[in-house]
A protein has these predicted regions:
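Structural beta-strand segments of beta-rich domains
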Residues: 40, 163, 176-178
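Carbohydrate-binding surfaces of carbohydrate-active enzymes
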Residues: 1-160, 168-172, 210, 281-285
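A glycine-anchored, Pro-Gly-centered beta-turn/N-cap motif
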Residues: 48, 215-217
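Glycine/proline-rich low-complexity spacer/linker segments in large multi-domain proteins
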Residues: 103-122, 126, 227-279
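Short, hydrophobic/aromatic-enriched beta-strand segments in well-ordered soluble domains
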Residues: 96-102, 165, 220-227
């Protein structure tokens, strides 16, 4: 608590930040506060679920910093002394704005508790972007990192690959909030259901709303995953210059790095985890 006070004090944060939250809640999420006109704006970040008591006794809205959506909190109410208690679920290393007094209409309630409908365990057809050494397509019986592949073209691949599969949904889900949880992604993914773009996931919990695209019965699924170009540079470091797939002004070294000052990549450096790692699940959330 002393550390947090010093940190916020160095940023000229007002003392009311610390009075606005319960001491117990302050240890759960990191937070900051500012006023804009008549609005109180709180930014919170952390992991998991907690109930937070705010000094402001008004009606809160929750603003999602990733997609700009504005919703009512999943649960909120008044305390005996007139303050507002809000229940927030930030997931894994998530963030949200809780805003009081802003002239913004919520689009609905924040997603509630999740229940798994299905996990996709069938083999994936994966099509790799051309020009980076990977085969045109491969079949992944289960989701594994590209950098662990026995095929050097996949192992050192950098770029975008499209994972294709399908899933079935039962009847009776019309009007329900459905999403797809991608599990672990390295580094970012776009989701398409039945050919319709649903959203991009680049940070935990790597979950995309598919409510408008999914239907009862068979659904086609495409997940386009992109990584950084680091692995291809490391792979190219072992190749003669004329056989490399990348062009860069960085120096590439065959073997181990000998200098301590960063100036490029060496062929024996550790590869970055890449690809869709899953598990991929279809999720229903209470609204």
């Amino acid at each position: 608590d002393v550390y947090k006070r010093q940190l916020f004090a160095s940023a000229s944060a007002p003392e009311e930040i610390f009075a606005a939250l319960k001491p117990a809640a302050a240890t759960k999420f990191a937070y900051a506060h500012r006023r804009a006109g008549d609005a109180d704006i709180y930014f919170l970040t952390g992991s998991g679920r907690d109930r937070i008591v705010f000094a402001n006794g008004g009606t809160p809205t929750v603003w999602n910093p990733l997609d700009g959506s504005i919703t009512e909190p999943e649960r909120f109410g008044k305390t005996a002394d007139g303050r507002t208690e809000v229940e927030l679920d930030l997931g894994e290393r998530g963030a949200a704005f809780v805003v009081f007094g802003a002239d913004a209409k919520p689009e609905g309630k924040a997603p509630g508790a999740a229940s798994e409908i299905a996990e996709i365990k069938t083999p994936w057809e994966v099509r790799f972007e051309g020009g980076m050494g990977a085969p045109e397509k491969a079949v992944f019986e289960k989701l594994t990192p590209w950098n662990e592949s026995s095929d050097d073209g996949i192992k050192y691949f950098s770029g975008t690959a499209a994972y294709k599969n399908s899933f079935k949904l039962p009847k009776g889900l019309d009007g329900k909030r459905l999403s797809i949880g991608l599990g672990k992604v390295r580094v970012a993914a776009q989701v398409f259901v039945n050919g319709q773009y649903c959203g991009t996931a680049w940070t935990p919990p790597f979950e995309v709303d598919i409510s408008k695209a999914a239907k009862a019965g068979e659904n086609s699924l495409e997940i386009r995953v992109a990584n950084t170009w680091e692995n291809r540079l490391i792979g190219d470091a072992a190749l003669p210059e004329g056989q490399r797939f990348t062009k860069s002004n960085m120096r590439l070294y065959k073997g181990k790095r000998t200098n301590t000052v960063y100036s490029g990549f060496a062929s024996e450096e550790k590869l970055s985890e890449s690809g869709l790692l899953g598990p991929v699940k279809i999720i229903r959330r209470d609204c």
